């Protein structure tokens, strides 16, 4: 048999196996819906981490019998579990959510076409009937509009997979009396935008917010002759390009923004990392009470005493209560350079006995502690086998 023919036969067999895999995944998803309905009826938690661990261990053991690496099985089924949890969360949210009948007003760093604008619409689409937008010029203005009852929700970016934490937002969280009530992750695809299609060497000036420049630094370094101009947001950069009407100007911005402002996309996906994701938080005047059935994040900020080992004592309390820490960030305190403020995300419902017990202990060993909010986790923490 010619080599080409045998290759086609093998590929055809793989295609048939892939079709079976997709069909089985669809069957699995149908069962997930039934499981979710049963959990809702019986008031059971969506996620059972102990069961997930046992299931994964059994699958790894089975995989070894078929000469499949444990890492491969782990990554594959963590993705399947994540999809399963997300499906159940959506169904429970639909069952519990009465907000779909009302509109909501969102403040964000504008103008239209900014990533904050995209995040506001994505969150509103999942939770409300309609999104009414309120464009702001600074993060502080975004928060003030909600504090002053001019808007219902503040949308703020808090961290990015390329450029890390957004310190300005952490500073605001220390001062505001608003609460985090939700989060949403947005895939960030920075594009090089111009008035019309031109050669890269014709560009003289490039506009954008400082974050995209940081996230696309590898690309920007290739053009040291370009003059960099910082703007209040990516949408503000696109707006300026349109207003100035100069073909030698360019901007880093979103594809949606390019359509809003009538700009051409010269190059796509310019970030240093492929998976460039920004996590946004939603703030409201009132804290949110979350069903114990839903995977939840509780966020705190605190300062410890200056004695050695203060932070490790806090972390030991979390470990003692078997609470999963999703994120820990530290910041120097202005005017007190020897002290630090810690921001921590914990995978737990604030109302749980474990968290309340942990809080009582943490309060005794910290100089300052503030609960920023308790809210549904958009992305679940992967389990370890």
Swiss-Prot record:
Pathway(s) per entry:
Amino-acid biosynthesis; L-phenylalanine biosynthesis; phenylpyruvate from prephenate: step 1/1; Metabolic intermediate biosynthesis; prephenate biosynthesis; prephenate from chorismate: step 1/1
E.C. number(s) listed in UniProt:
5.4.99.5, 4.2.1.51
Choose any GO biological process term that the UniProt entry carries and state it: chorismate metabolic process
Tell me which stretches of the chain form a coiled coil: none
Residues forming the Chorismate mutase domain are 1-92
- Region listing for Regulatory, in residue ranges: 286-385
Q: Does the keyword Nucleotide-binding apply?
A: no
Domain of life, per lineage: Bacteria
One example of the protein's molecular function in GO is: chorismate mutase activity
The question of whether Lyase is a record keyword is answered with yes
Functional description taken from the UniProt entry: Catalyzes the Claisen rearrangement of chorismate to prephenate and the decarboxylation/dehydration of prephenate to phenylpyruvate.
What NCBIfam families does UniProt report for this protein, alphabetically? CM_P_1 (TIGR01797)
Q: What does the entry's domain section say?
A: The regulatory domain shows changes in the ESRP sequence, which is involved in the allosteric binding of phenylalanine. These changes suggest the desensitization of the enzyme to inhibition by phenylalanine and would permit the overproduction of phenylalanine.
The molecule here is called Bifunctional chorismate mutase/prephenate dehydratase
Q: Which organism is it from?
A: Buchnera aphidicola subsp. Acyrthosiphon pisum (strain APS)
């Amino acid at each position: 048999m010619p080599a080409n023919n045998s290759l086609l036969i093998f590929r055809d067999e793989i295609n048939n196996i892939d079709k079976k895999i997709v069909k089985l995944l669809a069957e699995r998803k149908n069962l997930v819906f039934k499981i979710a309905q049963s959990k809702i009826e019986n008031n059971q938690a969506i996620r059972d981490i102990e069961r997930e661990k046992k299931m994964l261990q059994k699958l790894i053991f089975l995989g070894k019998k078929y000469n499949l690496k444990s890492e491969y099985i782990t990554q594959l089924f963590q993705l399947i579990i994540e999809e399963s949890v997300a499906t159940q969360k959506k169904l429970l949210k639909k069952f519990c959510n009465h907000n779909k009948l009302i509109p909501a007003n969102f403040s964000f760093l504008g103008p239209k076409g900014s990533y904050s604008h995209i995040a506001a619409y994505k969150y509103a689409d999942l939770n409300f009937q309609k999104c009414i937008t309120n464009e702001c010029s600074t993060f502080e203005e975004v928060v003030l509009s909600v504090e002053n009852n001019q808007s219902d929700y503040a949308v703020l970016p808090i961290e990015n997979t390329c450029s890390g934490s957004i310190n300005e937002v952490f500073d605001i969280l220390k001062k505001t009396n608003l609460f985090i009530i939700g989060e949403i992750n947005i895939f960030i695809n920075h594009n090089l935008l111009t008035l019309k299609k031109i050669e890269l060497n014709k560009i003289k000036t490039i506009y954008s917010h400082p974050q995209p420049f940081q996230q696309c630094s590898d690309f920007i370094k290739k053009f040291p002759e370009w003059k960099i101009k910082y703007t209040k947001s990516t949408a503000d950069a696109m707006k300026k390009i349109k207003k100035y009407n100069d073909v030698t100007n360019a901007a880093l911005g979103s594809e949606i923004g390019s359509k809003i402002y009538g700009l051409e996309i010269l190059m796509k996906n310019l970030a240093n990392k492929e998976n460039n994701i920004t996590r946004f938080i939603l703030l409201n005047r009132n804290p949110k009470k979350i069903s114990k059935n839903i995977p939840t994040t509780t966020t705190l900020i605190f300062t410890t005493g200056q004695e050695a080992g203060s932070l490790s004592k806090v972390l030991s309390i979390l470990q003692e209560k078997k609470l999963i820490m999703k994120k820990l960030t530290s910041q120097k305190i202005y005017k007190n350079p020897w002290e630090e403020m810690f921001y921590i995300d914990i995978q737990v419902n604030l109302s749980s006995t474990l968290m309340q017990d942990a809080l009582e202990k943490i309060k005794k060993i910290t100089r300052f502690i503030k609960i920023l909010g308790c809210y549904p986790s958009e992305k679940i923490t992967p389990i370890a086998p």
